[in-house]
């Protein structure tokens, strides 16, 4: 005799958060955009490499713009209205990613540069000679 099968939910329901934090990590080789809620739980992320850019194309401003648009597009449908932006790193995609976030329609409360700067800490590695 067959037992009635239990319904197993494979995925939790997506969280709805009206306010979030957008972290942009722009290195010289790639740009990673992570969207979290105010407690720090990751809701969405995207990078230039995950958007299909490979090699030297990952470090372009257009790749950073595409990564930012991909990370934010799902969350706007879920009801996110307001965001804080934290930008880290010296890469070429930081300005373009910020421009894409502004054009997405989210209300940006503030933009903060959280790039780590040493107060004369460790000695830097030697300069490359090419």
Curated annotation (Swiss-Prot):
SUPFAM superfamilies: Translational machinery components (SSF53137). It holds the Pfam family Ribosomal_S11. Its main location: plastid. Keywords: Chloroplast, Plastid, Ribonucleoprotein, Ribosomal protein, RNA-binding, rRNA-binding. GO terms for molecular function: rRNA binding; structural constituent of ribosome. One of its GO terms (biological process) is translation. GO terms for cellular component: chloroplast; ribonucleoprotein complex; ribosome. It is found in: Plastid, Chloroplast. PROSITE patterns: RIBOSOMAL_S11 (PS00054). The keyword Phosphoprotein does not apply. Transmembrane segments: none annotated. Part of the 30S ribosomal subunit. PANTHER family: 40S RIBOSOMAL PROTEIN S14/30S RIBOSOMAL PROTEIN S11. Belongs to the universal ribosomal protein uS11 family. This is Small ribosomal subunit protein uS11c. It comes from Staurastrum punctulatum.
